[in-house]
């Protein structure tokens, strides 16, 4: 669900926005109590000293990493109300510096890490919830994985339907989840209030000193309580800063702390219940309802991660970082409701592979977190640069503050390194693959623009050379020539002239530009240049969160009398150019021959039909003009 940009820009607060944020933003971090404390305490003696030390680390991690770093500092780095690593990249593009190529690499690698996280989060969340069946009977344990698999299959198969009809329920359902886990925690804390001493950071420091190297590596388990914190920044554009802050400080944070402390209080007197400390703090009669509530909460958390991945993909496509893969709008009312079939399939295969390979939430936890940790580090570095170059903070303040953040994240990363060999390598390798594909695509488009289109003569000169007015006219015919991002010279129109030696009565050459802001105001939408009496070049500006719809934009332009001539968009013919890219061993355009082959493959498979779909052109009135390019 997306709310109006006016609300976002004014940071308007409503309880509806806060409730919506609760359902989408905090699902991931909100379901961490299912497994985080169990994983952290496994393998060490379950005694009061260790429990207080771990609880103190959890408390201060949530305060420093989420409450202070993300909600107070990182939130400042929004791009016109939009958050996330690609929005941050677009913000950096406002400052043209020598570091811009580095920012591209950092951002696309971070995007790849988030895609890897999108595979692991549904797996560990749903499996950990269904594992609650073991509290009902040991005989139900063999059914945990099949039931979790069925839930995940249904979750991914229903993505094409969208969440418009049930999305409004996410907030109230997650609110029920938070209230439930808070009450369960309070019941235990009242009986054993000694756990409240863990608020004192002394216990965290004493625990790390006493446990030494083993205690340090337990930070990998502690990090699980802040996974999902990155979603707070990514979802600024959906709900705004103030509703997210309100939901965190008044609902999510207190409820999470109460539950973690409640689990700890129970373990102090019943250390044998470490096998499933979350479900064991509930009375036996509440096991089944709690399993149902937990499963619903984890499905919502998984849905939020999947939707965020779709949104990230759309940003990458519009910013020209990846091919124009099919993006389906699942709601006519909310532009944020989208479905990306190919990404959904990749996430599904990855999630099911993790489930079947690791089988339990404990095993999944040994692979989970390192990708999120790396992504947080990358965001820290980019925001630190923004603080110096855009916010004009003093170098000393930036070094002190972000030095602290980097030190904490590096400490977590060091503790998470062992996860690389226990499955954490999968999302990291996937991130490298995705980053390389994005890099090859971006570099290939730039090469195509600079070597095949940039050097073309000005269209007005070519029109004179061809004696445009003496060419055969097609009276009553209006043609719209669409040029891609790499083509600023009207290649489709020029190829049409050379092939036909005749011209439509009205010619409009359309080029679109995705600006480095999420939404473009109507007053800045159009730029028009008249090349001849009946030939115009129109540039349409979009934001990186908008849906490109050329016919709709042209219809609005006609209604506002922006164009010097009249034509009917509903009867006009659209022309698109489809380049056929071939890799050549004789000359080297990109870094490697197989990189050229990859770019050529992507261009061949994501140009013709997908260009027509991407621009929302009518198939029955669109003509594709082929051209041949050898790299």
From Swiss-Prot:
Keywords attached to this Swiss-Prot or TrEMBL record, sorted alphabetically, are: Cell inner membrane, Cell membrane, Ion transport, Membrane, Potassium, Potassium transport, Symport, Transmembrane, Transmembrane helix, Transport
Of the GO CC terms on this record, one is: plasma membrane
Q: Is Cell membrane among this UniProt entry's keywords?
A: yes
Q: How does it sit in the membrane?
A: Multi-pass membrane protein
Superkingdom of the organism of origin: Bacteria
Does the UniProt entry include the keyword Cell membrane? yes
Localized where? Cell inner membrane
Q: Name one Pfam family in it.
A: K_trans
InterPro entries membership:
K+_transporter, K_trans_C, K_trans_N, Kup
A GO molecular function annotation here is:
symporter activity
Q: Which reaction does it catalyse?
A: K(+)(in) + H(+)(in) = K(+)(out) + H(+)(out)
Record PANTHER family: LOW AFFINITY POTASSIUM TRANSPORT SYSTEM PROTEIN KUP, OSMOTIC STRESS POTASSIUM TRANSPORTER
Function field: Transport of potassium into the cell. Likely operates as a K(+):H(+) symporter.
Q: Which family does it belong to?
A: Belongs to the HAK/KUP transporter (TC 2.A.72) family.
Protein name as catalogued: Probable potassium transport system protein Kup 1
Q: Which organism is it from?
A: Legionella pneumophila (strain Corby)
